């Protein structure tokens, strides 16, 4: 892990207030050293402590600041309009491909900013559950905190509840899946992967900064097939044309009018 630390916003630092309970819990879990804000600027703190990344707890968000001036903070992104469409009775391609039903258990192996996870959680309803894995400690910290604290007036109560039902875990999916092998029966109905694309078609500045901390390890056929033995229904992998030619699926859905499609491997 790069050299990093966590601190408070200027307003909290000015009043000698430390990290909130949730931020402190994250710092303890990820072993992130806490430094005093002392009314200093972010650039000054990064320089003073020779940091690669500084996490700053702002109001309702945890922001990652890089040495080069870029920053990354949580936003639910496309899950906002997607959930609105679902509420209006429209279909969602991913939800349809997953084949989930109310009460199902889903494992999202690549949380990222959790746009897909939030949408899935909403579709599952309060009876369902979703666990979201993230191998990058920085992305895990920012997104995990954001899921718990995001508070934008335009978001519906149902959406905030969907965000709150997601269980984030900082772990490589290879490790987590290997541990699942020891269970007597499948723990999840559906397992989902959204590997990070090395060459995005287009992206916002927020996604660009997230990519600095992302894990680009490729999904292998071995892991894909292992996942197929650990779920009750199917494994679904989001991919863009040409990015996952090395993987073999039972079928591919989508892609006719979109650059994205989904590979499906039925449970074994």
Question: Where are the regions a protein language model picked out?
Answer:
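Conserved proline-anchored active-site loop of SAM-dependent methyltransferases
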Residues: 107-116, 187-204
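Conserved Class I SAM-dependent methyltransferase catalytic core
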Residues: 220-267
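Local beta-strand N-terminus motif with an aromatic residue
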Residues: 51, 187-188, 232
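Conserved SAM-binding loop of SAM-dependent methyltransferases across substrates and taxa
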Residues: 113-127
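S-adenosyl-L-methionine
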Residues: 1-105, 114, 133-190
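Mobile active-site "lid"/loop adjacent to the S-adenosyl-L-methionine
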Residues: 195-223
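Residues at the starts of beta-strands that form the adenosine-phosphate
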Residues: 105, 129, 165, 233-234
């Amino acid at each position: 892990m790069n050299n990093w630390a966590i601190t408070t916003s200027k307003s909290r630092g000015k009043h000698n207030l430390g990290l909130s309970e949730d931020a402190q819990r994250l710092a303890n879990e990820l072993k992130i050293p806490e430094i005093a804000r002392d009314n200093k600027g972010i650039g000054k703190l990064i320089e003073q402590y020779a940091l690669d990344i500084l996490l700053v707890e702002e109001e309702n968000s945890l922001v990652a600041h890089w040495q080069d001036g870029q920053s990354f903070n949580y936003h639910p992104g496309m899950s906002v309009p997607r959930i609105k469409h679902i509420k209006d009775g429209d279909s969602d391609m991913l939800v349809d491909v997953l084949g989930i039903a109310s009460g199902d258990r889903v494992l999202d192996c690549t949380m990222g900013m959790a746009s897909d996870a939030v949408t899935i959680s909403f579709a599952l309803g309060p009876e369902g559950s979703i666990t979201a894995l993230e191998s990058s400690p920085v992305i895990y910290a920012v997104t995990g905190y954001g899921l718990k604290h995001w508070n934008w007036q335009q978001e519906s109560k149902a959406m905030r509840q969907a965000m709150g039902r997601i269980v984030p875990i900082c772990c490589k999916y290879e490790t987590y899946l290997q541990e699942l092998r020891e269970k007597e029966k499948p723990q999840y109905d559906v397992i989902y992967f959204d590997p990070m694309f090395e060459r995005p078609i287009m992206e916002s500045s927020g996604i660009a900064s997230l990519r600095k901390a992302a894990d680009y390890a490729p999904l292998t056929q071995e892991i894909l097939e292992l996942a197929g033995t650990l779920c009750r229904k199917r494994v679904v992998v989001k991919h863009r044309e040409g990015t996952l030619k090395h993987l073999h699926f039972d079928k591919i859905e989508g892609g006719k009018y979109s650059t994205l499609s989904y590979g499906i491997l039925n449970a074994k």
